């Protein structure tokens, strides 16, 4: 086994396992421990559950350390099989459901796939999210300037500062129609807001990045090029930040933030509603 791995961590569900992963990762991030993550979705029958149990037990036998198991399983028979394993098992949903049951004075009605599955109750939200993703893809990197008025936010920035991944995350996670527009090297001699963006200034949000980080990212894409040179990166970042200040466009330095953090900060600063899917 890998000596750098302190614990093996399983995320198990009879659905997508997204909930188990998200909550499990949040918990594990509180501890200074190296982990080997194993995600097992759609554990929906006894034969698969027994195979998962065997996998957990095998790791225990090999390492002598109990694997950590975060699970979200509503089928009692499946859950019982996992609980018989040699893992340290934590029902991440039940830990919250039990106290709420007393507060609400209601019994839960657990259904597999309810959180991330497609069902009549969430079809409208699902369709809205797909529409947001389609819109965002069609308006990535300035591909199209049509229907920009339908965007909820328009991200600006130099090439490789994080516009595309942030736009896609906003669309996929929150159902936000996010367009993005790049400022390229040819724009820098006379950098101004494009005419199509001026009437939509209330939707504009700028991204910037430290020149050193930008140069490193670009170097991976175009090695030893003017595009990746420190001089070029410093100049572009300086010009774009000056444009943001001149036009009073809210902006964020993305250097030390994850895509998730950037997107959340944009939602907060722009006053956009968070719609979780």
UniProtKB/Swiss-Prot annotation:
Single Gene Ontology MF annotation: ATP binding
Keyword annotations from UniProtKB, A to Z: Kinase, Nucleotide-binding, Serine/threonine-protein kinase, Transferase
UniProt keyword annotation of Kinase present: yes
EC number: 2.7.11.33, 2.7.4.28
Reactions this protein catalyses: [pyruvate, water dikinase] + ADP = [pyruvate, water dikinase]-phosphate + AMP + H(+); [pyruvate, water dikinase]-phosphate + phosphate + H(+) = [pyruvate, water dikinase] + diphosphate
Pfam family, one: Kinase-PPPase
Catalytic class of the enzyme: transferase
Annotated positions binding ADP: 157-164
InterPro entries, per the entry: Kinase-pyrophosphorylase, PSRP
Record family assignment: Belongs to the pyruvate, phosphate/water dikinase regulatory protein family. PSRP subfamily.
Function: Bifunctional serine/threonine kinase and phosphorylase involved in the regulation of the phosphoenolpyruvate synthase (PEPS) by catalyzing its phosphorylation/dephosphorylation.
Name under which the protein is recorded: Putative phosphoenolpyruvate synthase regulatory protein
Native source species: Enterobacter sp. (strain 638)
